Amino acid sequence: QGAQPITSYNFGAGNAARVRESFRLLLKVCVIYSVTLWALVMLFPQLFAGMFASDAQLVDFAARALRIYCGAMFIFGIQIACQMTFVSIGYALCSIIVAVMRKFVLLIPLIYIMPQLLADKVSAVYAAEPAADSLAVLFTIAMFAVNFKKALRKLEEEQKNDALS
């Protein structure tokens, strides 16, 4: 969220190059963070599960579930960076749409569909999360590519018109 005022300021000032630059930096930071967190969960799931339970069987079950549930966490930084940038450039509705897409439009149906496709019904429910995350990131990238280019093109045109005035 620290990038939001910087991106918003530069967008408001008409500085498209700085908006692009702040998005690239935000994307790098978010991806590094999500990949790091994903790696920690994949390498040490018992550590995380053990924070909430002490029973060995429960910790083992939760550790396995965490690995499945967080399977696509490494790509989530992309969605976070795009959502923050949408808000920063005045496209809050786009941010809401991709959030709703991930948790309601994709996840809820996948929770019901995945157990029909996989033999292990419990794992299938957990697998709905990374499936929804993966599809949501693809949707977010497509939506972001279109709207970010449109917003920056409009900004650059306004700057040209102001320069000619």
PLM features per residue range, with description:
Residues 1-45, 76-95:
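Small-residue-rich hydrophobic transmembrane alpha-helices
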Residues 2, 38-39, 74-81, 100-108, ...:
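Hydrophobic alpha-helical transmembrane bundles that constitute the permease/transmembrane domains
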Residues 30, 66-69, 73, 99-100, ...:
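Residue-level recognition of transmembrane alpha-helices
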Residues 36-59, 63:
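Short membrane-interface helical motifs at transmembrane helix boundaries
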Residues 41, 84, 110-111, 115, ...:
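Structural signal for membrane-spanning alpha-helices in multi-pass inner-membrane proteins
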Residues 45, 104-138, 152:
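Membrane-interface helix-loop junctions in multi-pass transport and translocation proteins
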Residues 56-82, 109:
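Alpha-helical transmembrane segments of multi-pass membrane proteins
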Residues 150-165:
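Intrinsic disorder in cytosolic terminal tails and internal cytosolic loops
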